Amino acid sequence: MSATDRVNLMCANVLAAVAWPYANGPRHIGHVSGFGVPSDVFARYMRMSGHRVLMVSGSDCHGTAISVKADQEGVTAQECAEKYHRIIAADLQGLGLSYDLYTSTLTDNHAHVTQEIFTRLHENGYVVKRSEMGAFEPSTGRTLPDRYIEGTCPVCGYDDARGDQCDNCGRQLDPADLIGPRSKTTGAAPEFRETEHFFLDLPALAESLASWIDTRTDWRPNVLKFSHNLLEELRPRAITRDLDWGIRVPVEGWQDNPMKSIYVWFDAVIGYLSASIEWARRIGRPDAWREFWNDEDARSYYFMGKDNIVFHSVIWPGILLGTNGRGDKGGEPSEELGTLNLPTEIVSSEFLTMSGSKVSNSRGATIFVGDFLHEFGPDALRYFIAVAGPENQDTDFTWEEFVRRVNFELANEWGNLVNRSISMAFKNCHEIPAAGELTDADRELLDAAAAGFDTVGGLLAHARFKAAITEAMRIVGLANAYISAEEPWKLKDNPERRDTVLHVALQVVSDVNTMMTPFMPHSAQKIYEALGGEGVWAAQPELIETDGAPILMGDYATEQASWGRHEITVGTPLSKPSPIFRKLDAKLAQTGPQWAPVNPQ
């Protein structure tokens, strides 16, 4: 049984839960290298393999960061969140991320589901009230989220540890633990005051969490390392904050307090569930979400950057265990939600850096997605992230490497194979020619391409994107070498052999295009049409205006792309092809574009 067959037998329902980008500004390429492109490659492959996929996410619209940005722009927090949600949704549509639903945390549905989870945890005994020393910005008196406080880790000495965890050693922290704490907003030392909050009682869930994590042997090593480090010293974690911008706390005496709200990290992770419920209602099947959340045979994959591992590998599973009543204190699942599935796999990427620094809005090392798409289109970025992105280690983005990848791999190798194969077939036949008797060289190339579906598919099923696209490009290299060796342009006196070579080349182009579809769906559609295909090969998300806010959805059932060889049809008319990939000016490697120069002055 092939690797692809084994995956297809596992289950039919696959949840692709994609980290929620924060709506306090446009997203940069570092963001989409962590959550965006990897999740879409995976979701598209799973759909092509016959799975029923639900890919959900949305804009994270609550919390102090939104309030701070709103103050800077002289607008309300609601207006700020709505503005950037609209920008982010448009960018993600342009990138071709095939969400079944991309929404936001501003919906009534999301508030209701968040409060239902909070209430069930509270009733099951996993939410406790206690006092703590809260951090406040001295200049404004506004609460400082843990992630807005930096300092030196008391465990490993890392200088840029955050108030909730150290990204270097993975240790869970409180702001008061940091050595030399400072506000990321102003650089001032925070003011600590006693305040009362509700906490998620993670110690009461520790044993269940440890037992569950021990079963996650196929997770990426970086995720397992972080998760085990976090389990060593679990402590209660605050899930409310002194802030007027957020979801109200569903507890008597707190519900009407305008200065108490649910902590943004808590409501954000619940977004995967609330978005699934919203999706089901929007398609007219209000219980369809249960097929992905209550069905024990369903599988769920969570995509994020490494700075979000803590929330997805330990805290979100802890919330789910507590909601299900599976911690030390027992309890019952929510009657409304039922028993909820825990994550099958956490697919975490490392950081994309620029000149060794993390791509960051606050640090000035930024290439915004919208700018990139406007100049280079989506597939150049998608390809770069897949083949050279931070899948397993921090990766430095340089314009030199980007230009090299586009010009020498996309244009010279893959684009050249497509264009010369179709051009020669059009020039000589004006249609897909029939193959005569096959030689060993013909069969060898066709067999290599056919085998690629198992190899590439098996890698994609295990979220090994870089290895998968590298294997597809290896087949491109074999095909180019085959054409160079067979020299069909010299076979005018042997048209049967010429047509056979061209038929083999076109079949391999079709095969590789299928393998490339999850990575580069826009160019895959063009190549499909260049081969005479009609209709939708790779569907794209649609931006839909609803209730005054945009969402992304898509009718992916209309697409014809499926995983495996599609035999080309002899006699299909061909047209003279246009180049699929535009070569970039070599000077760009040294200068960068005007909006993101290599050496900004």
Curated annotation (Swiss-Prot):
Its EC number is 6.1.1.10. GO terms for cellular component: cytosol. Its cofactor is Zn(2+). It is found in: Cytoplasm. Keywords: Aminoacyl-tRNA synthetase, ATP-binding, Cytoplasm, Ligase, Metal-binding, Nucleotide-binding, Protein biosynthesis, Zinc. Zn(2+) binds at C153, C156, C166, C169. Gene3D superfamilies: HUPs, Isoleucyl-tRNA Synthetase, Domain 1, Methionyl-tRNA synthetase, Zn-domain. Disulfide bonds: none annotated. ATP binds at N361. It catalyses: tRNA(Met) + L-methionine + ATP = L-methionyl-tRNA(Met) + AMP + diphosphate. One of its GO terms (biological process) is methionyl-tRNA aminoacylation. CDD domains: Anticodon_Ia_Met, MetRS_core. It comes from the Bacteria. A motif ('HIGH' region) lies at residues 21-31. It holds the Pfam family Anticodon_3. Is required not only for elongation of protein synthesis but also for the initiation of all mRNA translation through initiator tRNA(fMet) aminoacylation. Belongs to the class-I aminoacyl-tRNA synthetase family. MetG type 1 subfamily. HAMAP family: Met_tRNA_synth_type1 (MF_00098). Monomer. This is Methionine--tRNA ligase.
